[in-house]
Amino acid sequence: MAAKEVRFGDDARSKMLKGVNTLANAVKVTLGPKGRNVVLDKSFGAPTITKDGVSVAKEIELEDKFENMGAQMVKEVASKANDEAGDGTTTATVLAQAIVTEGLKSVAAGMNPMDLKRGIDKAVIAAVEELKALSTDCADSKSIAQVGTISANSDAEVGDIIAQAMEKVGKEGVITVEEGQALQNELDVVEGMQFDRGYLSPYFINNQENGTVELDNPFILLVDKKISNIRELLPTLEGVAKAGKPLMIIAEDVEGEALATLVVNNMRGIVKVAAVKAPGFGDRRKAMLQDIAILTGGTVISEEIGLELEKVQLEDLGTAKRVVINKDNTTVVDGNGDQEAIEGRCAQIKGQIEESSSDYDKEKLQERLAKLSGGVAVIKVGAATEVEMKEKKDRVEDALHATRAAVEEGVVPGGGVALVRAAAKLSELTGDNEDQTVGVKLALRAMEAPLRQISINSGAEASVVVNEVKNGDGNYGYNAGNDTYGDMLEMGILDPTKVTRSALQFASSIASLMITTEAMVAELPKDEAAPAMPDMGGMGGMGGMM
């Protein structure tokens, strides 16, 4: 085991604080509408330019191991805030730095670190309740666009496109962000349920111009097995032909004789038919077939529940207004399923999302939920260069997370005002003893830090701005974008409650642990031994010399 270096007390804490400040100072320049960019060097390719706090934090590793420990703990604050709410990483970092700095001053002055921690915790719990009381619902497109705009660093175009996407696919819908080909941002919306399986044979195509299969008001047969014997399908084909409607088959696979017969029937015009493979694999395939069944009002034909393909009746088939199939995707528009059954299935999937511990499973469940409840929107980010594209895509993703958080828990006045108002309401709060009260007060003082930093980044005098905002009440605050004061909600400067709340909780959690640190242990740096000099052989022709 390698030898370790141990540092104690103020020596340890001062090293840790230096690391905290190095990381936080690099991150906090990005805060607010007039925040600056940070350029990150990459080992290959062009450098990345970003205003995303967590992206900056993740790049920072310090040479001194004790300083690095402080930096890594603040990095954890930014990462946690990003995981929880998808935004607010810079705010969380600024809060953590403020609490640690104030806290370590109090420890140096002889306060008990554990009592300080209890005081900080008490203040934060009370402040979170105040934030919830300040919160208002974020339901209409205008406020969603405003939240997106603020989170994308005052880019109104991004806010508007996210609001449009949410309007099209609903609050639960899946919205994905991709790199586009154009210079402008574009929004693509897929109505209905789409899954990534195309037609099994190009002979099913009936729209030659687009290379797609288009079926109007089709019956939909859902089968949880491979179909290779046409005899099993004959009763269904006859029933559908009599009804004079097209048929779409979704099965594990359709092959051999069965597929050939379907193609021949289709080409002769006896029955308009198309077949696709069921989406997903294993248990997920069964679940997705069941989703399609509920959406279209059909039944999954599965031998597991005693249903045989030969005995299928027309009432077992699902129906939809329209189905469009290309070589890669199938889209079912306006399934005729029972609305109550669809809502019940959505509620069931939401329950599974909450219980799931796997990010991958959560993502897949979220996709299924979106497909059932509205559709999928794709925001294609446009930019002139690859460097700009990366920076813009980061901002759009941040804004998307922020708007989801806003819809979930509501919004509070932005620009650091909510934290100042919450702190003002708690000015009478005290701890169980003097040291705890100091902890309470330092946490409330630290809650002014985001507003101070926004002011500094916009070139204003921080103390003047903070006093002006404190003298006001309600939503009155400072708009750093145009250097004016007024009602933050009316000016459209909103922050999601969830983002502000989680930034404060994670910052105080890690910062109060750092305040209570008394010793730090790190490996001693290894001395790199200089390589031995190579043996110098005798010079040629010197053999006879004595």
From Swiss-Prot:
<comment type="subunit">
    <text>Forms a cylinder of 14 subunits composed of two heptameric rings stacked back-to-back. Interacts with the co-chaperonin GroES.</text>
</comment>
<feature type="binding site">
    <location>
        <position position="415"/>
    </location>
    <ligand>
        <name>ATP</name>
    </ligand>
</feature>
<dbReference type="GO" id="GO:0140662">
    <property type="term" value="F:ATP-dependent protein folding chaperone"/>
</dbReference>
<dbReference type="GO" id="GO:0005524">
    <property type="term" value="F:ATP binding"/>
</dbReference>
<feature type="binding site">
    <location>
        <begin position="87"/>
        <end position="91"/>
    </location>
    <ligand>
        <name>ATP</name>
    </ligand>
</feature>
<keyword id="KW-0963">Cytoplasm</keyword>
<comment type="function">
    <text>Together with its co-chaperonin GroES, plays an essential role in assisting protein folding. The GroEL-GroES system forms a nano-cage that allows encapsulation of the non-native substrate proteins and provides a physical environment optimized to promote and accelerate protein folding.</text>
</comment>
<dbReference type="InterPro" id="IPR002423">
    <property type="entry name" value="Cpn60/GroEL/TCP-1"/>
</dbReference>
<dbReference type="GO" id="GO:0042026">
    <property type="term" value="P:protein refolding"/>
</dbReference>
<feature type="binding site">
    <location>
        <begin position="30"/>
        <end position="33"/>
    </location>
    <ligand>
        <name>ATP</name>
    </ligand>
</feature>
<keyword id="KW-0143">Chaperone</keyword>
<dbReference type="InterPro" id="IPR027410">
    <property type="entry name" value="TCP-1-like_intermed_sf"/>
</dbReference>
<keyword id="KW-0547">Nucleotide-binding</keyword>
<dbReference type="Pfam" id="PF00118">
    <property type="entry name" value="Cpn60_TCP1"/>
</dbReference>
<dbReference type="GO" id="GO:0051082">
    <property type="term" value="F:unfolded protein binding"/>
</dbReference>
<dbReference type="InterPro" id="IPR027409">
    <property type="entry name" value="GroEL-like_apical_dom_sf"/>
</dbReference>
<dbReference type="InterPro" id="IPR027413">
    <property type="entry name" value="GROEL-like_equatorial_sf"/>
</dbReference>
<keyword id="KW-0413">Isomerase</keyword>
<dbReference type="GO" id="GO:0005737">
    <property type="term" value="C:cytoplasm"/>
</dbReference>
<feature type="binding site">
    <location>
        <position position="495"/>
    </location>
    <ligand>
        <name>ATP</name>
    </ligand>
</feature>
<comment type="similarity">
    <text>Belongs to the chaperonin (HSP60) family.</text>
</comment>
<dbReference type="GO" id="GO:0016853">
    <property type="term" value="F:isomerase activity"/>
</dbReference>
<protein>
    <recommendedName>
        <fullName>Chaperonin GroEL</fullName>
        <ecNumber>5.6.1.7</ecNumber>
    </recommendedName>
</protein>
<dbReference type="InterPro" id="IPR001844">
    <property type="entry name" value="Cpn60/GroEL"/>
</dbReference>
<keyword id="KW-0067">ATP-binding</keyword>
<feature type="binding site">
    <location>
        <position position="51"/>
    </location>
    <ligand>
        <name>ATP</name>
    </ligand>
</feature>
<dbReference type="InterPro" id="IPR018370">
    <property type="entry name" value="Chaperonin_Cpn60_CS"/>
</dbReference>
